[in-house]
Design a protein with these regions (language model features):
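Conserved beta-strand positions that form and line the central face of beta-propeller blades
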Residues: 35, 66, 80-83, 104, ...
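Sec/Tat-exported extracytoplasmic proteins
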Residues: 40, 56, 88, 105-109, ...
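Acidic, glycine-rich catalytic/binding loops that coordinate metals and/or anionic ligands
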Residues: 1-8, 37, 76-77, 91-100, ...
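Beta-rich strand-turn-strand
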Residues: 65, 88-114
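Zn2+-dependent peptidoglycan hydrolase active-site motif and core
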Residues: 47-88, 114-116, 120
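Surface-exposed, glycine-biased beta-strand/turn segments
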Residues: 1-63, 72, 98, 111
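Extended aliphatic helical segments
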Residues: 52-53, 64-69, 96, 105, ...
């Protein structure tokens, strides 16, 4: 079960668990995912092999695709790919290999920092939309599952 970063580290603009001045001023929770800034319309490679288990639209996260994956210890996780450019063409039940296109980078929802992929990691589908307290550091998990 090899996991991979969707984009280079130098494209990261938001780290899991950070509390920027803006987030503090707006009385927001710490950042709940990892953000990679990319040009709108850039294909997003799947972080890991898995199955599409949800396609959602959220006022905050915009177009979202949720993928069920396993780590190297065979534990089940859910990766949320958020702020997609448009509704993904993939459907629930589709199998996606690591590196295959999962959607396109966008700024749907309340993506206030421009086009980027906001990716989250949770133990449940609903957790993808929850606060930091029900999420995990996706970047760290990728490093541990290379």
């Amino acid at each position: 079960m090899i996991w991979q970063k969707p984009f280079p580290d130098n494209r990261i603009t938001g780290h899991y668990g950070t509390l920027s001045d803006y987030r503090r001023k707006m009385k927001m929770q710490p950042h709940s995912g990892t953000d990679w800034a990319m040009k709108a319309g850039t294909p997003i490679p799947a972080i890991a092999r898995g199955t599409v288990v949800g396609i959602f639209e959220s006022k905050i996260l915009g177009h979202v695709l949720v993928q069920r994956v396993q780590d190297k210890n065979k534990k089940i996780w859910f990766i949320g790919y958020c702020h997609l450019h448009k509704k993904p063409t993939l459907k629930e039940g589709d199998r996606v290999g690591a590196g295959e296109t999962i959607g396109l980078v966008g700024n749907s929802g309340s993506a206030s920092t421009g086009a980027h992929l906001h990716a989250t990691l949770s133990k449940t589908i609903k957790g993808v939309f929850g606060p930091t307290s029900v999420k995990f550091d996706l970047y760290k998990a990728i490093e541990e599952n290379k």
